[in-house]
Amino acid sequence: MLKEFEIEPLLKDKAPHQTKAIVAMSGGVDSSVAAALLYNLGYEVIGVTLQLYGSDGNARKGACCAGQDIYDAKYVAESVGFPHYILNYEEIFKKEVIEDFANTYMRGETPIPCVRCNQTVKFRDLLQVTKNLGADVLVTGHYVRRLEENGEVKLCRSIDKSKDQSYFLFATTEEQLKLLRFPLGGFYKSDIRKLAKYFGLQISEKPDSQDICFVSESYSKTIAKLAPQSVQKGKIVDIHGKVLGEHSGIVNFTVGQRRGLCIAHNEPLYVIKINTENNEVVVGPINALMQKKILVKELNWLEQPKEGMEVTVKLRSSHAGSSATIYSTDEKNKACVILNDDYFGISPGQACVAYKGEQVIGGGWICS
């Protein structure tokens, strides 16, 4: 059966039995199959799981990197036959991801903690672990492809577009890509389930992790615990500054939101902006949410775009993509993206990821 699931060699100049691979294991089906597949292909596999939160027993069911998932990862490693280590990264994760999540909401923005986690914890620190252990590559179960052409490494969308995770990996650097490998990018999720059963993994039918891993309650309750000031009452105003009502905390709102405003009005109202300086939620009609111009900060380019380059951009993970043009700005490490067509509800704090065909050329964080 393995002949049906051929992958590119992890290293072109080393045979599998000479290649040491660290596999980041979350306890889910994907990373477990990645590890089992490489082991069965003859690679020297070492599984590593990061304990990111939940040592107090409060991990949410269906999350990753905590609680039962850590035991699942260890059990898979033991049943297949390769070593597995658990590293406690709770303090780093709390500072770099959880606190950033709350602070981003406090700035009136909508965060993507999965990108921050990859950027500041999983890739940065696990790559260092990979080097410390004298391994050749770091492998993950992400649905994304890494292609080498003419000595250049490219990050590309997965074959399975319904599972593609390239949006969440836009902050990956060229240096990191040299050591990273994504063996599942050329397969469909259904293939991975088949492989899990073939390898006899007890987690073959385990559901995919859903939502933000460390949020055990609602977003608002989680953030309220981290930043109590986020639930202070304030005014709801229209785009002209007229007071329309009162809100129970900016944490309960995000740009583009319609539900939960509790305001009687002659037309539907949406959240246009969250003004954190005076604790106001600004609302308005749908046309006030339509825009073409986006300012992007903290840029990471895997391929430097030319001035006026035409690309496809994704403005949220579920976005199919919009045609756009990229321009430089006078501000350092910022870019201006002009969409061909108006887009609804562009949210500061989300990522703007640029593609050239299937290739991720980079992106940044939306300012406005």
From Swiss-Prot:
Matches recorded under CDD domains: MnmA_TRMU-like
Its biological purpose: Catalyzes the 2-thiolation of uridine at the wobble position (U34) of tRNA, leading to the formation of s(2)U34.
Catalysed reactions, as listed in the record: S-sulfanyl-L-cysteinyl-[protein] + uridine(34) in tRNA + AH2 + ATP = 2-thiouridine(34) in tRNA + L-cysteinyl-[protein] + A + AMP + diphosphate + H(+)
Site, Interaction with tRNA: residue positions: 142, 350
SUPFAM superfamilies: Adenine nucleotide alpha hydrolases-like
Single Gene Ontology MF annotation: tRNA-uridine 2-sulfurtransferase activity
Chief place where the protein resides: cytoplasm
Residues that, per the record, bind ATP: 24-31, 50, 141
Positions of region (Interaction with tRNA): 163-165
Location of the active site: 117 (nucleophile), 213 (cysteine persulfide intermediate)
Disulfide bridge positions per record: 117-213
Gene Ontology annotations for the cellular component aspect, listed alphabetically: cytoplasm
A Pfam family: tRNA_Me_trans_M
Family, similarity comment: Belongs to the MnmA/TRMU family.
Localization, UniProt: Cytoplasm
EC number of this enzyme: 2.8.1.13
UniProt keyword list: ATP-binding, Cytoplasm, Disulfide bond, Nucleotide-binding, RNA-binding, Transferase, tRNA processing, tRNA-binding
Organism: Wolbachia pipientis subsp. Culex pipiens (strain wPip)
One biological process term in Gene Ontology: tRNA wobble position uridine thiolation
Name of this protein: tRNA-specific 2-thiouridylase MnmA
InterPro entries xrefs: MnmA-like, MnmA-like_C, MnmA-like_central, MnmA-like_central_sf, Rossmann-like_a/b/a_fold
